[in-house]
Amino acid sequence: MTANYTKARYFSFIIYPESIPTDWRVCLEKLGLAMAISPLHDRDEKRDSKTWDDNNDLIVNGKHYKKPHYHVLYIAKNPVTTESVRKKIKRALGVKAVSHIEIVDSVENTFKYLTHESKDAVAKNKHVYAKTDIVYLNDF
């Protein structure tokens, strides 16, 4: 296994409601780092029928939706590794809280993706969520 020591300040990750504590926002705020959290993404449609899973998908009116989740844009005070971010989030929210963390190349694009207003999300005709439902932590 090769360790990745690439450092960055801007990251994004996904959290699922069933894998986080009820006071998850307070737990994240206690980290003291600037974050923006998307509205709950509960209308992300799975358009490719090959990816449908009748046992785990949310199905409404015959349409299949991805499991509800939040996107988090995380800004570190100094450059850190993805693994250090993962450890910090797991300490705050529990070991099952986060599985995938990405380094963000464009804060603006990632921020727009929180509500599916990024160019890519618009091109894919994704459901648009309300900007007023974005949660800002620690002076984001």
Residue ranges of predicted features:
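Catalytic "initiation/cleavage/transfer" segments centered on a nucleophilic residue
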Residues: 1-11, 16-25, 85-140
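Flexible, charged surface loops at secondary-structure boundaries
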Residues: 4-7, 30, 65-66
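Short secondary-structure junctions
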Residues: 27-36
